[in-house]
């Protein structure tokens, strides 16, 4: 079994290609004033705004702290997601999507990369042509997300031959039509898509599946400032080590990355290798 610290050292020497949509996340921090007398809405007072590089750019920010060489294929389309956020408790009130045109992504040359990492946010980047090209990758990891812009129409089942798949619980349930049953029931069907499967469970940690075996790992923190990007951090780090890692090490390192990101508002900063090692030592 390769130690967790050695896994991070292995990742540092890899050449990775990160593919996915480029998203700009904008937070407008507001102070709620109350309900106007004539309208069924809530009035707010704008305090300030903050802009972050999200989507594949945020994932790359985490990966660059660990991996020696990281390239990006983002298709050229910029998506803006503006959120109005109650400033005192960082509670999001509503969100607006803005897509500035659409460019069909070019299929990247995947030769020469140790790992190809796909962040599929369901906004059109992962075309069938792109998916058909993935078997040419030496090792392919994918995170297939469900959000308000694609609910029910961006399922992991559109992929067929991944090495590593990482989704959250709602995404796993949608992909396997498992509304009320145990989440464990979703793992074998997802195991037909990828050799290694991880389902993140929020405050309940994460569960992994490989070769018919199920592994669970509890979450590492109860402190959550902002959940945005925690799953991306989990995936960005674990995608770099999934090939060599045993399942428990994969889950522990992912949970450490997610715990660190959950304490950061938006994408203000990436998680560092030093922070990741310190978190793993703290929970050992």
Where are these regions (language model features)?
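Ribokinase/PfkB-type carbohydrate-kinase core domain
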Residues: 1-40, 44-227, 242-256, 263-284
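Short basic (Lys/Arg) and small-residue
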Residues: 231
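Flexible, glycine-rich loop/tail regions that form catalytic "lids" or insertion modules at the edges
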Residues: 237-238
């Amino acid at each position: 079994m390769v130690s967790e610290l050695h896994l991070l050292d292995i990742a540092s020497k890899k050449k990775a290609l990160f593919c996915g949509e480029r998203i700009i996340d904008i937070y407008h921090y507001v102070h709620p004033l109350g309900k106007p007398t004539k309208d069924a809405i809530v009035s707010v007072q704008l305090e300030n705004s903050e802009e972050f590089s999200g989507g594949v750019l945020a994932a790359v920010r985490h990966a660059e702290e660990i991996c020696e060489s990281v390239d990006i294929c983002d298709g050229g389309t910029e998506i803006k997601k503006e959120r109005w956020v109650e400033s005192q408790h960082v509670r999001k009130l509503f969100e607006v999507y803005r897509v500035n045109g659409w460019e069909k992504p070019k299929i990247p040359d995947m030769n020469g990369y140790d790992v190809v990492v796909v962040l599929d946010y369901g906004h059109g980047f992962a075309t069938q042509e792109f998916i058909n090209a993935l078997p040419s990758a030496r090792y392919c990891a994918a995170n297939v997300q469900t959000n308000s812009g694609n609910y029910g129409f961006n399922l992991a089942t559109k992929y067929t031959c991944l090495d590593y798949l990482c989704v959250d619980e709602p995404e796993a349930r949608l992909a396997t039509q498992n509304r009320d049953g145990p989440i464990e029931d979703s793992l074998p069907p997802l195991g037909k898509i990828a050799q290694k499967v991880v389902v993140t469970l929020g405050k309940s940690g994460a569960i992994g599946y490989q070769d018919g075996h199920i592994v669970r790992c509890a979450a590492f923190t109860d402190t959550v400032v902002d959940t945005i990007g925690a799953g991306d951090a989990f995936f960005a780090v674990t995608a770099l080590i999934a090939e060599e890692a045993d399942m428990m090490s994969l889950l522990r390192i992912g949970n450490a990355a997610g715990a660190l990101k959950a304490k950061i508002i938006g994408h203000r900063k990436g998680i560092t290798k030093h922070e990741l090692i310190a978190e793993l030592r703290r929970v050992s």
